[in-house]
Amino acid sequence: MTTAFDAAHTEGPGFVGIRFCQECNNMLYPKEDKENKILLYACRNCDYKQEADSNCIYVNKIMHEIDELTHIVPDVISDPTLPRTEDHACPKCSHREAVFFQAQTRRAEEEMRLYYVCTNQNCTHRWTE
């Protein structure tokens, strides 16, 4: 039996919802059927089981965005694998050299961005253009 609540809360990409037993209304828990190698949802109160419609039982969405410049660690200036440029002077101290790297923001439809970190040990200002 599908309720209006179920329909409204089981749509959208990556949604993994809570399922309830049709017999006793207790919560169903993921369980492996080892013999048939399928994922089931089983009630711990009665013997009710239902086959899962997806192999995903948990989604962890990370909402942190690299766009938040405060999360860029200034120690990246010591990373020898990062490229360096002298074409983008630091807007804070005017030092000529900066390390840079490319990253995508939270929204996949946006373009990749270049992030810069000033290599001046006394500055380590972070910016993007």
From Swiss-Prot:
Subunit comment: Component of the RNA polymerase II (Pol II) complex consisting of 12 subunits.
UniProtKB keywords: DNA-directed RNA polymerase, Metal-binding, Nucleus, Transcription, Zinc, Zinc-finger
Annotated positions binding Zn(2+) 1: C21, C24, C43, C46
Domain of life: Eukaryota
Source organism phylogeny: Eukaryota, Metazoa, Ecdysozoa, Arthropoda, Hexapoda
InterPro entries: DNA-dir_RNA_pol-M_15_CS, Rpa12/Rpb9/Rpc10/TFS, Zn_ribbon_RPB9, Zn_ribbon_RPB9_C, Znf_TFIIS
Family: Belongs to the archaeal RpoM/eukaryotic RPA12/RPB9/RPC11 RNA polymerase family.
Gene3D superfamilies: 2.20.25.10
Cross-referenced SUPFAM superfamilies: Zinc beta-ribbon
Location(s), subcellular: Nucleus, Nucleolus
Protein name: DNA-directed RNA polymerase II subunit RPB9
Zinc finger motifs (TFIIS-type), residue ranges: 86-128
A single GO molecular function term of this UniProt record: DNA-directed RNA polymerase activity
GO cellular component, one term: nucleolus
C4-type zinc finger locations on the chain: 21-46
Binding site for Zn(2+) 2: C90, C93, C118, C123
Organism: Drosophila melanogaster
The protein's role, per its UniProt record: DNA-dependent RNA polymerase catalyzes the transcription of DNA into RNA using the four ribonucleoside triphosphates as substrates. Component of RNA polymerase II which synthesizes mRNA precursors and many functional non-coding RNAs. Pol II is the central component of the basal RNA polymerase II transcription machinery. It is composed of mobile elements that move relative to each other. RPB9 is part of the upper jaw surrounding the central large cleft and thought to grab the incoming DNA template.
Position of the signal peptide: none
Single Gene Ontology BP annotation: maintenance of transcriptional fidelity during transcription elongation by RNA polymerase II
Gene: Polr2I
